[in-house]
Amino acid sequence: MVAPSSSPWSFPCFVTYRKTLGLNKIKPRKVVNYQKLNDVTIADSYPLPNAETLLDELHGAQYFGCLDLKSGFWQVELASKEDRQKTAFSAYMLGLHHYNRVPFGFRNAPSHFMRVID
């Protein structure tokens, strides 16, 4: 999912804590602040479906299925080395790393993920 990097890019990362649904556990989660990268990224205009459109498409169907796309973005590989380098983050005492998969917080992640699903 991540690999050591020599990228010219570097974004700050930090740890936040979140409650686990249904459990009384608090789990740490690493977060990378991609705000500056997102500010200069051209938005991908791939359409994201809305609930009403999806329900209209299901009208008259006899069978339904359900997929759990847990951590879906992390299932999608970043194809180009250039894009991987843009995801580089600096972790205290661990050095510089970059993602090999689409990270959360990346501006075009939802559109890219939807394109793969479609």
Which residues does each PLM region occupy?
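Retroelement reverse transcriptase polymerase core
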Residues: 1-118
